């Protein structure tokens, strides 16, 4: 059973027991290598099929189009009481489907869509721009996240605070209402704040922004493609502006804005729960290495949404080990690598609502264990 999970007590009539104590992931250098793990995975799991990859794009966009048609032609004709219920349902369902589209674009950024980089970048640019994501900008910062996962100094996103970095105001939010408020703000504003102001991102000595070609996030050779990302965003914004002029701002907000808000919320939630858990360590430069860093992630269970999100939720450990592997092979690979990883593999089946509150409560900052001089840091919550 994975860290933080629950189990049924067979002698207690099936009643739930108290949660088991969360066991820490081993932080010593593992007795296996990336090569050992790769050898165990069937070779076909690394094959990328253009036809199969496009089939997922077609499927997702078909479902999204059907939902759009229903909302545009029927929800707007409903009487007010029913419309007030139908619109949030549309936003939630369409947002989930478009999150799947987002995941495919993310896969393009990893060169996991096809064997052709130009095709991956073209598809990724179109899909991500439609969702107001700067494709190349995020592709490069996300690549650095994969290169530095688990490093408290060089990871790119959801970098945990050290105890010394916790603001004095945090104590006023360290209560149930404060945690709920923190979650609401994070899920609604976290994604645009990260892209625009690098909130929760790696520390840079000057302003870092995903829309700025001269941002310290990027190297000189990457800057031209940041302009392309910005052009893609501006093109979509222009289309939305024209739609607002012809169909009205309310139409744009209900048909596009609501689902996009759900997409943005899921992106933050999924990433947060993939890399935040009381069992997971972080490392400074004296201890960090790529393999241990890649293993500081955890698979989760989103129920039926696992499939809607193309299993980015429950195969994330495998994804961090082999990011060019297409999502439709990731589950098979995950099943194969579990016995090799042993306790280094983490899965938590805790319900998502409970998990996001628990992690907000328990994972406020990281610190070393007392009287330990190594560079291993663990989540704490005592302010």
UniProtKB/Swiss-Prot annotation:
Pathway info: Lipid metabolism; polyunsaturated fatty acid biosynthesis
Keyword match Transmembrane helix: yes
UniProt motif Histidine box-2: location: 142-146
Transmembrane segments: 50-70, 85-105, 118-138, 180-200, 226-246, 252-272
PANTHER family: OMEGA-6 FATTY ACID DESATURASE, CHLOROPLASTIC (PTHR32100)
Tissue expr: Expressed in leaves, flower buds and developing seeds.
Span(s) of short sequence motif Histidine box-1: 106-110
Ranges for region Disordered: 1-29
Organism: Calendula officinalis
GO-annotated molecular function: oxidoreductase activity, acting on paired donors, with oxidation of a pair of donors resulting in the reduction of molecular oxygen to two molecules of water
Its biological purpose: Catalyzes the desaturation of oleic acid to linoleic acid. Introduces a double bond at position 12 of 16:1(9Z) and 18:1(9Z).
Protein's UniProt name: Delta(12) fatty acid desaturase FAD2
Annotated family: Belongs to the fatty acid desaturase type 1 family.
Enzyme class: oxidoreductase
GO biological process: unsaturated fatty acid biosynthetic process
Coiled coil (residue ranges): none
């Amino acid at each position: 059973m994975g860290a933080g999970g629950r189990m049924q007590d067979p002698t207690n009539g099936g009643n739930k027991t108290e949660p088991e104590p969360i066991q820490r992931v081993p932080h010593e250098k593992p007795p296996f290598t990336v090569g050992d793990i790769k050898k165990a995975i069937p070779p076909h799991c690394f094959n990328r099929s253009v036809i199969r990859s496009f089939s997922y794009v077609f499927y997702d966009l078909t479902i999204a189009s059907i939902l759009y048609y229903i909302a545009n032609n029927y929800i707007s004709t409903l009487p007010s009481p029913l419309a007030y219920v139908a619109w949030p349902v549309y936003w939630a369902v369409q947002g989930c489907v478009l999150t799947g589209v987002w995941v495919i674009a993310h896969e393009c950024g990893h060169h996991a869509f096809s064997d052709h980089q130009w095709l991956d970048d073209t598809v990724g640019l179109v899909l991500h721009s439609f969702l107001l994501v700067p494709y190349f900008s995020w592709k490069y910062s996300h690549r650095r996240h994969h290169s530095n996962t688990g490093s408290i100094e060089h990871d790119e996103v959801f970098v945990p605070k050290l105890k010394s970095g916790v603001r004095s105001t945090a104590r006023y939010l360290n209560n149930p209402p404060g945690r709920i408020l923190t979650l609401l703000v994070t899920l609604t504003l976290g994604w645009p704040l990260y892209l625009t102001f690098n909130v929760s991102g790696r520390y840079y000595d000057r302003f870092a922004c995903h829309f700025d070609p001269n941002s310290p996030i990027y190297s000189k050779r990457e800057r031209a493609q940041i302009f392309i990302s910005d052009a893609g965003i501006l093109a979509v914004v222009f289309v939305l502006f024209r739609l607002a002029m012809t169909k009205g701002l309310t139409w744009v907000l209900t048909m596009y804005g609501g689902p996009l808000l759900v997409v943005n919320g899921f992106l933050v939630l999924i990433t947060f729960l993939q890399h935040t858990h009381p069992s997971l360590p972080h490392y400074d430069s004296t201890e960090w290495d790529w393999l241990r860093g890649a293993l500081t992630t955890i698979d989760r269970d989103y129920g039926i949404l696992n499939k809607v999100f193309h299993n980015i939720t429950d195969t994330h450990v495998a994804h961090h080990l082999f990011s060019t592997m297409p999502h439709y092979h990731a589950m098979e690979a995950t099943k194969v690598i579990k016995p090799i990883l042993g306790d280094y593999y983490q899965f938590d089946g805790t319900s998502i609502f409970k998990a996001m509150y628990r992690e907000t409560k328990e994972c406020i900052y990281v610190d070393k264990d007392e009287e330990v001089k190594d560079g291993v840091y663990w989540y704490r919550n005592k302010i």
